[in-house]
Amino acid sequence: MASPCLTKSDSGINGVDFTEKFRLEDSTLLANGQVVLTDVPVNVTLTSSPYLVDKDGVPLDVSAGSFIGFNLDGEPKSHHVASIGKLKNIRFMSIFRFKVWWTTHWVGSNGRDIENETQIIILDQSGSDSGPGSGSGRPYVLLLPLLEGSFRSSFQSGEDDDVAVCVESGSTEVTGSEFRQIVYVHAGDDPFKLVKDAMKVIRVHMNTFKLLEEKSPPGIVDKFGWCTWDAFYLTVNPDGVHKGVKCLVDGGCPPGLVLIDDGWQSIGHDSDGIDVEGMNITVAGEQMPCRLLKFEENHKFKDYVSPKDQNDVGMKAFVRDLKDEFSTVDYIYVWHALCGYWGGLRPEAPALPPSTIIRPELSPGLKLTMEDLAVDKIIETGIGFASPDLAKEFYEGLHSHLQNAGIDGVKVDVIHILEMLCQKYGGRVDLAKAYFKALTSSVNKHFNGNGVIASMEHCNDFMFLGTEAISLGRVGDDFWCTDPSGDPNGTFWLQGCHMVHCAYNSLWMGNFIQPDWDMFQSTHPCAEFHAASRAISGGPIYISDCVGKHDFDLLKRLVLPNGSILRCEYYALPTRDRLFEDPLHDGKTMLKIWNLNKYTGVIGAFNCQGGGWCRETRRNQCFSECVNTLTATTSPKDVEWNSGSSPISIANVEEFALFLSQSKKLLLSGLNDDLELTLEPFKFELITVSPVVTIEGNSVRFAPIGLVNMLNTSGAIRSLVYNDESVEVGVFGAGEFRVYASKKPVSCLIDGEVVEFGYEDSMVMVQVPWSGPDGLSSIQYLF
């Protein structure tokens, strides 16, 4: 990591003048002169950020951020918990680890409200009516725990509203007592820009990761996918995969991605012979004590014989046959754990690198996370672990075999196991660096640098050290069809939890990886609820339906005939007025998320109330008293129009066309006009927000809406050209395309041919056929 200047100076750094936003005066941390933390201990230090430009040389707001550190008296240790001051009566939102592998959203107002293993905190600005440019009040403040040297940090509550920083190496052999840049604080008047600007500073400071904007997500993000997990669990086999793909193709929803999940590898129990595969393991959970025996696939896939050539066998033949038969299948991914399998490698396996059984050790913070079957099984049986100097050999062996078999990428699971195995390997930071470097090198060599879905990775170790190449990752806990603890209501409230996990986690993780909201099942009672969120998530869309059990009517609102999807330009985030609220168990707050398509905004409203984290029981549970019909308001200003790589200018826009997907109603609205929404439990509404433009030649007001048969309606709009007396819209997809027009057109043309159209409630309706192999059409509206 680069070493920042440790000297504060009112005259600036390197001759650049600035006024610092953060000051430490009289044991008080101030931002814009407003109190952030009080009773700051005397051993706490504040150092201005020295970084003048980002990695591209673009100037940074050098005054906006500072580093917090502290000196600790006494003998250096591997684990410290130190206060950086008291937080009192300031609303905050945070992201914390509720499981070893997964994080979620948490809100509060005082230091005592902070959860263990908190990865990020954002403090609200002062004054409920404050807004951008409010100036003199307290700005939004980001507090970000960092890595320093061989130590990693997180937040937790301390005594009497202290904000405590937990600093740990993970190994008693790695100790320290002085930290200079262990927390970064950043201030700004836009909470979304705040996080992005802060991450640009940390990108330069650490130089151990790349931001999402520097990378390209894999092509699977634009394809409809099918994952085998909930369809087969561990019984997945070539015949079943073939039948699953064929059923989707025959139903008009061909997948572009097939993800072969857990169940394809050669694994075994320690009690079995080294040549005995665990083929009788069929129940999820039974496989976790098993270890990898070899890089090659198990007999289910190894015994595959191509119907085209009896000599063509194994995974390679199966992959080739599947792609040859189903032309839309562009990508086949397979699952593997970071350490090979749930139980790691079998130490005596001759085809694998040498490994040693290590008993994982939970840190004090992890001991307070939710009980988890995977963690229990792993601790019970240990991990067959290849030392970090063998990690490159391990990934090369596994990934070279998969690439040779025609596999296009991997879902890497159980990523945050390393911190439990690091005692003898220099601590968690050094071990993570070694393993992630080896993984990155292999992915660059075998899977185009980006052919990875990261999973079970929700911790700052991975975000700061594992994302140099990886650009796609899960942002929520698993999609749970039912509650594994047996609560029948979990079929519903767990779905609300899933939405909130993904939406809020993306505010943090979306800076490093394209958010993946996970699979779902199209026949689940909350399937449409899930489908709506995936449609506007900005990430991949894939299902885990059992073979032959599909809701094709729903799927066709997500999937185009060529296996593509209508993906948003950005990634979905909570609306600004929901950042510091609790959409899971306050009984009143509706989740609202926003995203951008190429020419429009989109808002999603979801009633998620009914379950979530309980501090007392240390687990997610039902809060049935919070299940209510909710009413909320939304408006075009809920869309953050200036965000993303292609922001939409609304500087001269006076009116917006709002299209509600459920009722198919059109409303006209000003930027700040409120629209009231009422939603029953686990129901949703999607709203296309389209800026209205006046056509100069005839004063017709016009706004494109999109394909109303698709959940991401305006995602179908690929081009938009306004002429003096006409508008031309490029469309991707097929179905009923609508636009708002204040007057009825004289005629409509599709690809130069005059077509019939309808005009009702100020909407022009045209039926667009699927055009050619690429599904692109051009509609002209003549006025």
From Swiss-Prot:
BP GO terms, sorted: response to oxidative stress; response to water deprivation
Protein's UniProt name: Probable galactinol--sucrose galactosyltransferase 5
Induction (record text): By oxidative stress and cold treatment.
EC code(s) of this entry: 2.4.1.82
UniProt-recorded Gene Ontology molecular function terms: galactinol-sucrose galactosyltransferase activity
Gene Ontology CC: one annotated term: chloroplast
Positions bearing Phosphoserine: S9, S11
Function: Transglycosidase operating by a ping-pong reaction mechanism. Involved in the synthesis of raffinose, a major soluble carbohydrate in seeds, roots and tubers.
Species name: Arabidopsis thaliana
Keywords, sorted A to Z: Carbohydrate metabolism, Glycosyltransferase, Phosphoprotein, Transferase
UniProt-listed InterPro entries: Aldolase_TIM, Glycoside_hydrolase_SF, Glycosyl_hydrolases_36
Top-rank taxon, per record: Eukaryota
Entry-linked SUPFAM superfamilies: (Trans)glycosidases
